[in-house]
């Protein structure tokens, strides 16, 4: 099949350094993950509408769309346009995971929560005309997925025109879930309270591959990189000899543990 994976535009798609430019320039991690899990018998085209136009005339056999709440009006408009052309649309992401009935007004199928382990099944169901209205996969026990096609993790960071500098960065998600249940946050509901993570070797292999592609800076897309403190200590110790600069999110009580010194050490020895 010919598959189109689409990340809808954030708002007005104006390019330039503004409050949303960082979010817009980060590659759509969910789509990169699904592309890497797609068997080689299929063709995959990733379109990030923040940087390129969607070609609605392309002969896709199916379209997959992701989107947060701020993107969802555009996601639904894109889905409606493809369905007018007879293309099956599967939609996923945080917003539709919480509101699948709303999403079914614009898509043929909704994949809730984390799609990794059932993605190939969804593709088979599209191919055999057995697509379900809603898929409710279980949370994966491990994030060490077998990839069918390596997808580049590296992207160019947008910089002001007056700054003659090109920064190559890479995005890697190391773990999902958070043991807390903060009232303002959807992570626990979406990814669960049990922290799932990649093996240390899996992470360091991804870092080495991205460095070989020219990455000089890393964004670890975890919601709480120190959620599992023992794992975090092992992770930072493994990152120290790789000499990288990195950015991530964590909870403030990281300062109460010697883990913060390992985190600093994992970056201060960068070249």
Residue map of PLM features:
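Conserved SAM/AdoMet-binding glycine-rich loop
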Residues: 3-6, 200-271
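Acidic, low-complexity intrinsically disordered segments
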Residues: 1-213
């Amino acid at each position: 099949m010919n598959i189109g994976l689409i990340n809808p535009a954030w708002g007005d798609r104006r390019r330039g350094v503004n409050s949303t430019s960082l979010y817009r320039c980060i590659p759509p991690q969910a789509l990169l993950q699904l592309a890497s899990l797609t068997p080689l018998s299929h063709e995959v085209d990733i379109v990030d509408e923040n940087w390129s136009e969607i070609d609605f005339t392309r002969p896709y056999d199916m379209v997959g769309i992701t989107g947060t709440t701020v993107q969802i009006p555009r996601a639904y408009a894109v889905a409606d346009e493809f369905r007018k052309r007879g293309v099956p649309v599967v939609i996923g992401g945080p917003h539709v995971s919480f509101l699948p009935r709303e999403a079914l007004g614009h898509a043929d199928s909704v994949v809730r929560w984390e799609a990794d382990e059932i993605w190939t099944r969804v593709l088979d169901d599209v191919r055999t005309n057995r697509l379900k209205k809603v898929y409710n996969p279980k949370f994966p026990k491990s994030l060490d997925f077998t990839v069918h096609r390596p997808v580049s993790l590296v992207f160019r960071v947008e910089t002001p025109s007056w700054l003659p500098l090109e920064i190559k960065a890479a995005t890697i998600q190391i773990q999902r879930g958070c043991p807390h249940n903060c009232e303002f946050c959807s992570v626990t509901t979406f990814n669960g309270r049990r922290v799932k993570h990649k093996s240390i070797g899996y992470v360091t292999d991804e870092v080495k591959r991205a460095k070989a592609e020219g990455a000089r800076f890393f964004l670890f897309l975890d919601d709480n990189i120190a959620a599992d403190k023992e794992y975090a200590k092992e992770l930072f110790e493994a990152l120290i000899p790789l000499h990288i600069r990195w950015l991530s999110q964590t909870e403030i009580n990281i300062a109460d543990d010697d883990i913060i010194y390992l985190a600093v050490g994992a970056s201060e020895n960068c070249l």
